[in-house]
């Protein structure tokens, strides 16, 4: 494992997983859409395939913002071994009762996580 960060804010109801690789053009809007959620009872997990662009720097730039909102934020960056392996890594890191996947080039609307 090359790098791993975990900011744990308790047991979440929902785990949201994003798998990414060289996603600097889209990942900021993806992550921001989770910060804009109307609820905070979730955790966000990003699994990066050792991006060669600025994806990791963008992911790092959100660490304190999630901490300030009390949202668990975890990310890992390891050599890419395939998308399904990356999804499994995210699932293994998750603690939520439910799991949802969000593409690195997609966003959630503000109320997407509301129950």
Language model: regions and residue ranges:
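Nucleotide-sugar donor-binding/catalytic module of glycosyltransferases
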Residues: 1-115
């Amino acid at each position: 494992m090359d790098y791993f960060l975990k900011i744990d804010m308790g047991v979440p109801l929902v785990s949201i997983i994003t798998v990414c690789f060289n996603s600097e053009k889209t990942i900021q809007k993806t992550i921001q859409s989770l910060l804009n959620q109307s609820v905070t009872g979730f955790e966000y997990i990003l699994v990066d395939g050792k991006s060669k662009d600025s994806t990791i720097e963008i992911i790092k730039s959100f660490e304190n913002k999630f901490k300030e909102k009390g949202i668990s934020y975890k990310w890992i960056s390891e050599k890419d071994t395939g998308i399904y392996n990356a999804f499994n890594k995210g699932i293994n890191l998750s603690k939520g009762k439910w799991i949802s996947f969000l593409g690195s080039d997609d966003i959630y609307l503000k109320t997407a996580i509301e129950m």
